[in-house]
Regions:
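Short loop/turn segments that flank or connect secondary-structure elements
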Residues: 1-225
Length: 225
């Protein structure tokens, strides 16, 4: 999906395009370190796999088996991507040209061929990619309708909160000296990805964890001043 990002075109909610999923699974191949899984994705993927019989009980187990870590900024801020397998770097969940976690697939996959970013003022901006031209045929799709179907309220609230805290968290991480960085990143992972009860609603846990993370990092940063 890296190519999709570089070839993205800005669209408005009223923009209409032609799109049809052909079942070719090309969007699931050549995706090494290209399919991000945010806290929301990790929660629901773990829950889905657990509830469908996989011997997995927590998000840490999911991340160890199915995700790879990537540094986003030299302050230590990191993210996760789904692992890829095989010579063609297929998504680890691609099975016989079908997604094996379809009901819980990541936000990036649900929204394809569209992408969502925040606009800096509490709203969203939308993009789409024409990287795979053969997808852009068939019925007309309106951005607004697509987002209403695939970018629902919980995902919107999560993304707004997540993006709002990204810069403050990165700033705090940057202010913590090297001798405290490992502890800071431990809390970063624990509260953003690990400390979740799969049987409780996600969003309230995420918001509580983010608040706690900012408090902890703030206290650690204050010790250096």
């Amino acid at each position: 999906m890296k190519d999709e990002l570089f070839n993205a075109v800005r669209v408005t909610p009223s923009t209409k395009i032609r799109f049809k999923c052909t079942g070719c699974a090309e969007c699931c191949r050549h995706v090494k370190e290209s399919v991000p899984v945010n806290s929301l994705d990790v929660f629901y993927l773990t829950k889905y796999l657990r509830d469908t019989g996989l011997d997995i009980c927590c998000t840490d187990e999911f991340l160890a088996q199915f995700a790879t870590i990537a540094l986003l900024d030299d302050c230590g801020y990191f993210v996760y991507f789904l692992k890829s397998v095989g010579e063609d770097d297929s998504c680890i969940f691609l099975n016989e040209n079908r997604c094996s976690v379809q009901p819980a697939k990541p936000m990036a996959c649900r929204l394809y061929p569209f992408m969502v970013d925040t606009n800096g003022s509490g709203g969203f901006r939308y993009l789409y990619s024409r990287e795979r031209e053969h997808h852009f045929c068939g019925p007309v799709v309106e951005t607004r309708s697509w987002m209403k179907k695939y970018f629902q309220q919980e995902a919107r609230a999560f993304m707004q909160a997540d993006f709002a805290d990204t810069v403050p968290i990165a700033r705090l991480l940057r202010s913590i000296p090297e001798h405290g960085k490992n502890e800071a990143l431990f809390h970063f992972h624990r509260l953003r990805y690990s400390e979740y009860n799969l049987d409780r609603p996600f969003l309230e846990q995420f918001l509580q964890n983010q608040k706690q993370l900012l408090i902890i990092l703030g206290r650690m940063a204050e010790k250096t001043t």
